[in-house]
């Protein structure tokens, strides 16, 4: 979202500048980082594998007025991922021109392989780059994002040309991480390559309580879909009140309350989870198709959850893995709704099946409610007693066991 201009165009120049900056910073870290075991330290220096990625893709797609499970969304994801990885390898080749390629580029034995299939990895590394480049032509043709596809093609041409001349400094450049809670610190509506969990969700806090999180991309999407400011205000107010953009039946009056959104625009706002008062959610195949749009342009794999409904069968789950394999995914993780006792993020206001005190009082008769309240007071008193009796916490410092490459070399020679 940070690279989307006010006129809706994607700022490729700033995006590529960010890619250059961070891939260079990650390359510098290889020689300044510490590693838990010697083999990881050695491999990190022989191949210099990095892991640049992005977050908030789902919000970017929604902001344009496209659904996550749409050809336009997949075209945008493919083009942006292609530019990111292609320019990372272009910068990798530029660093190789000055510093030399990674140690295993021309010497296959330096990785500790006694009898490698070939003395050098150079032709195989170039073959990998050529495969990435060939997939650019398979990005879906969408007029609105045609310029991004053209830029992706130019970027991979440059990465291949410079790599043939100089080799590559990092052997691996990109992966897609989940970005989890840190995504909230980056002001993201969505994490990694994920769609939004729900337009309104509730995060369970470690210290107790719930944090209500509203999707901030909805107004931008509605503007792109042609809604007036008054309509946008009414729709966002509906979402805030009912936790969904769908028409709902009011729980108090029993009357249908319309959100004001046109039926044909509902798929734009489909999310991973079904909202409390709604019926819509993304089909699990939509998750797989989005991953397949990005995977050909990544060095590594994608860490992403494929959300499946509670009604999913064993056959559905098997088919999901098989379909992911057929589409060339390197990894796949499935979450079946309600398969865990608790969840850090949910669409329920009370979270984890908990019920607010007033609601509980209304549902239970007076005698039952009083008994429950008495039991709660007893438990609170027991917790207070245990806290008072507990010993003060003692801080135990971890040993200095992590070493950089120089330390490993010194330890091995002594």
Task: Give residue spans per PLM region.
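Long, C-terminal-biased catalytic regions of enzyme "large/alpha" subunits
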Residues: 1-414
């Amino acid at each position: 979202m940070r690279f989307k201009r006010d006129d809706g165009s994607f700022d490729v120049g700033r995006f590529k500048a960010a890619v250059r900056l961070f891939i260079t910073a990650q390359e510098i870290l290889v020689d300044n980082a510490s590693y838990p075991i010697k083999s990881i330290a050695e491999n990190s220096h022989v191949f210099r594998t990095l892991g640049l990625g992005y977050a908030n893709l789902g919000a970017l797609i929604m902001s344009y007025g496209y659904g996550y499970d749409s050809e336009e969304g997949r075209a945008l994801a493919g083009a942006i991922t292609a530019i990111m990885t292609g320019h990372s390898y272009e910068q990798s080749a530029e660093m190789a021109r000055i510093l030399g390629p990674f140690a295993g580029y021309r010497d296959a034995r330096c990785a500790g392989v006694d009898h490698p299939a070939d003395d050098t990895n150079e032709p195989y590394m170039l073959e990998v780059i050529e495969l990435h480049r060939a997939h650019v032509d398979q990005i879906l043709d969408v007029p609105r994002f045609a310029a991004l596809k053209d830029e992706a093609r130019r970027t991979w041409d440059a990465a291949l040309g410079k790599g043939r001349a100089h080799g590559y400094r990092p052997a691996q450049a990109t992966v897609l991480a989940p970005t989890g809670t840190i995504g909230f610190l980056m002001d993201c509506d969505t994490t990694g390559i994920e769609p939004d969990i729900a337009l309104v969700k509730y995060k369970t806090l470690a210290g107790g309580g719930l944090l209500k999180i509203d999707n901030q991309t909805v107004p931008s999407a509605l503007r792109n879909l042609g809604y007036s400011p008054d309509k946008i205000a009414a729709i966002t107010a509906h979402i805030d009140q009912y936790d969904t953009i769908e028409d709902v039946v009011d729980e108090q009056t029993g009357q249908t309350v319309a959100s004001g959104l046109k039926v044909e625009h509902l798929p734009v706002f489909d999310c991973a989870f079904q909202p409390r008062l709604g019926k819509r959610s993304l089909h699990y195949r939509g998750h797989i198709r989005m991953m397949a749009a990005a995977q050909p342009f990544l060095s590594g794999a994608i860490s992403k959850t494929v959300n499946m409904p509670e009604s999913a069968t064993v056959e559905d789950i098997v088919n999901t893995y098989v379909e992911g394999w057929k589409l060339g995914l390197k990894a796949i993780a499935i979450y079946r709704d309600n398969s865990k006792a608790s969840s850090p993020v949910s669409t329920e206001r009370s979270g984890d099946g908990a019920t607010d005190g007033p609601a509980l009082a209304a549902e239970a008769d007076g005698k039952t409610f009083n008994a429950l309240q008495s039991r709660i007071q007893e438990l609170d008193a027991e917790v207070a007693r245990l806290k008072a009796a507990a010993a003060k916490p003692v801080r135990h410092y971890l040993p200095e066991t992590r070493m950089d490459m120089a330390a490993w070399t010194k330890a091995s020679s002594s």
